[in-house]
Amino acid sequence: MEKIWKEMYDAAKAVLNARQITEYVSCGEVAAAVCSKSGRIYTGVCVDTACTLGVCAERNAIFNMLTCGEQEIDKVLCIMPDGSNGAPCGACRELMVQLMADKYQDVEIMQDFAAERIVKLGDLTPEWWIK
């Protein structure tokens, strides 16, 4: 496995911090790391609200990447509360596809860090609804 995956896992784990902000808002139960094409790692946590205005950890990390002036994603990893990994939800996949419409197929997604199982976004999202 490439060294960058360990760096991403550690970066996401460092911000994984589940907490209740108010009776309506919680955050940090899921954390994500996105590696841009430049090799820089951006992190984010999920924000859950009582009225569905929350955001997934992956999108939060992508928004941090965009805030810092980058827009090309190379790798994505998310960590669940138990330390396991999972695939991005449909909304997160859609954002990645729209950001990289002609290149999204090659974005790497960590499915299982312990087993070193990596898939391509193109395998998870083989046909984009717009094209």
Describe every region a protein language model picked out.
Residues 40-41:
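Hydrophobic "anchor" residues
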Residues 64-70:
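Alpha-helix C-terminal capping segments
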Residues 1-22, 70-131:
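C-terminal binding/interaction regions
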